Amino acid sequence: MTSNVSGKAYALTLMCPIKGGTDNNNVAFADAIRDQLENWNAMATSPMARTPNTYLCRYYILDDVCTQSLPGAGIWDTISDILPMMPAKWRLAALPYEDHLKSRYLVFSSNFHGELEPYLQGIWRSAETDIRSIWRHCYGFDGVSDAATFIDYARRCQLDTSLFFVGSNDDSLAAQLKALYVKQEFSRFAQQTQDLPAAQLRQAYLQFMHRVKPRDDAGPSWTAGQRA
């Protein structure tokens, strides 16, 4: 597996710096983006459900990098125990240097089927209005006017990715939606027929297979963005 690619699956990570400042409601640009993303959660289906071939995607705002703790098993352990008793300027001087981001970032992470450019074209064509509203406060997005410039912008913000969503393989989105549908329907079938005698169970199973059509991806299935 190379960076970003595993078979026919692609893992995309974009980190897009957000401009400082506020909108017309005096809300910081990063917070305005966060509020809009929260509003997507209230929709029956996310705008990203319209984008072709998306297995799973996530947006979030990265405010800063976090220092979780001091290094273990060293002299800093002892010093950190007595730091609360020290004057403030001594405490700050004793702490290790911390890195911080110069901007807040809009992070977009997606696992999808296929190649990068057709996928980004699909995002733009199916959700251009939503994409503009989310990214408009990011540095560099002012130059995006069509699918081609959106692809160029995304490539400038892209980070190599080697970790994929473990709940998915590299089959087509239609095949994976079908598999989820069959799994759900078979669980329901097993629950409803567990007390049937053998002859009736066999007949019920044949009816189940005829209705579900497990080998037909174009037959009954889940829809993209569907909640179980």
Listing of model-derived features with the role each one plays in the protein:
Residues 1-94, 100-105, 111-114, 150-228:
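Short S/T/G/P-rich N-terminal loop/turn motif that feeds into the first structured element of a domain
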Residues 45-46, 99, 113-148:
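An amphipathic, aromatic/His-enriched active-site/gating alpha helix that lines ligand/cofactor pockets
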